[in-house]
């Protein structure tokens, strides 16, 4: 969530920066300014009313002590009237404050200066490209055909049990899935991330804190009986560990990693891009989260990008790194790098990770702060990234390692799978 100060200090700059994300912010900022001015005016009136009320209340006892009962009764009536007015002002203050908050949360985060201009994924900037490591057979099979051939993923059984987008992993497929999760977690913990195992259901405050609510409410599974949400990413519960927390400067950086199943409704998704593992309602993902001092958050982002790249490299997959344009960025992000691996069988790139700096946007919602060397309280910066999302990694591993004799397992994974070939 942006702060009022960010929006009011340089209105035109705020409008210009949000336009890069395709948002016409001028009408919203105008409304925010009006509501902010109204709130300040109500606060001023309320403070004056309470001061007068307190002064009048003090006078009642003195008047009674002097035997001036009629004047004391008049003061009591005045205090009662002032109390009624202060209650009305309090109610109005809350109403205006709620309206102000509702207006502010409609605005996305400012994109960083180096974010490319653009509206769609076609405008993203490729910052690195690494070609294929392996020679594939002619006419390679897509992963959904390989899954059927080797009986390692059953999409039809998932439909029977739940519905489309809920595959069942079997045999070597299930072991590969477990191996990847453990490999990713081990890579992360070796890099200094503390492993945590969070709940996969969160409350509304957690969803709001990281920015999924209200922006992505329609994409989240909602258990209405208890008003809990299934997590779309471990980012939500892990970052919310520090909601309403004030850290010391010496506590940074805070580095955490977690594996969770993730749940997304993906409403409106259809067509060839959703076949097989390309787009699921339930999938496994390992996440890394960092909390950083503001002046060090972009250095932290570079480190996270390098870390995710080291994992993709270890799997020996063809990949590229993109810097997302303003129109393709998330609501909460200030700067995002996407990792994509190439599917030769599908002739397309598959996203397997997004690594983002949110600056203070999430921290402002979370009330995640720290005390600096001067003991002043400031907002921290938050970052996160997938390291990695499994479905498309599995798809790419199957497709890029297929041979006439089976599917090779990358060397780095063999200690985790216990086998070197899917047959």
Regions found by a protein language model. Give the residues of each.
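TRNA-recognition modules of translation machinery and tRNA-sensing kinases, especially anticodon-binding
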Residues: 26, 129-423
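N-terminal alpha-helical targeting/anchoring segments
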Residues: 1-134, 152, 156
């Amino acid at each position: 969530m942006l702060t009022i100060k960010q929006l009011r200090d340089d209105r035109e700059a705020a409008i210009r920066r949000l336009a890069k994300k395709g948002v016409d912010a001028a009408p919203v900022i105008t409304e925010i300014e009006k509501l902010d001015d109204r709130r300040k005016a109500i606060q001023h009136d309320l403070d004056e009313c309470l001061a007068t009320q307190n002064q009048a209340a003090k006078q009642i006892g003195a008047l009674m002590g002097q035997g001036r009962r009629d004047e004391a009764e008049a003061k009591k009536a005045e205090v009662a009237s002032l109390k009624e007015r202060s209650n009305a002002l309090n109610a109005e203050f809350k109403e205006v404050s709620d309206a102000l908050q509702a207006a502010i949360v409609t605005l996305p985060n400012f994109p960083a200066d180096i974010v490319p201009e653009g509206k769609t994924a076609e405008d993203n900037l490729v910052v690195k490209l690494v070609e294929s490591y392996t020679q594939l057979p002619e006419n390679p099979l897509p992963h959904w055909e390989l899954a059927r051939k080797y009986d390692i993923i059953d999409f039809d059984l998932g439909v029977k049990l739940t519905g489309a987008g809920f595959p069942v992993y079997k045999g070597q497929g299930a072991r590969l899935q477990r191996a990847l999760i453990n490999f990713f977690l081990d890579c992360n913990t070796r890099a200094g991330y503390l492993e945590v195992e969070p709940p996969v259901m969160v409350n509304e405050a957690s969803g709001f804190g990281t920015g999924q609510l209200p922006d992505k409410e329609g994409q989240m599974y909602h258990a209405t009986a208890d008003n809990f949400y299934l997590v779309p990413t471990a980012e939500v519960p892990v970052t919310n560990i520090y909601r309403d927390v004030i850290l010391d400067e010496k506590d940074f950086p805070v580095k955490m990693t977690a594996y969770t199943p993730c749940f997304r409704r993906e409403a409106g998704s259809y067509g060839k891009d959703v076949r097989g593992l390309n787009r699921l309602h339930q999938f496994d993902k390992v996440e890394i989260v960092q909390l950083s001092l503001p002046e060090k958050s972009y250095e932290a982002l570079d480190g996270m990008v390098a870390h995710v790249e080291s994992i993709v490299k270890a799997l020996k997959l063809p990949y590229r790194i993109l810097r997302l344009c303003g129109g393709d960025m998330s609501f909460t992000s200030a700067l995002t790098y996407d990792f994509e691996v190439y599917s030769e069988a599908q002739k397309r790139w598959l996203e397997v990770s997004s690594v983002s700096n949110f600056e203070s946007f999430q921290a402002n919602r979370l009330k995640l702060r720290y005390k600096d060397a001067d003991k002043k309280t400031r907002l921290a910066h938050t970052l996160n990234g997938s390291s990695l999302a499994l479905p498309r990694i599995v798809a790419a591993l199957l497709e890029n390692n297929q041979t006439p004799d089976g599917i090779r397992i990358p060397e780095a994974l063999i200690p985790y799978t216990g086998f070197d070939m899917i047959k």
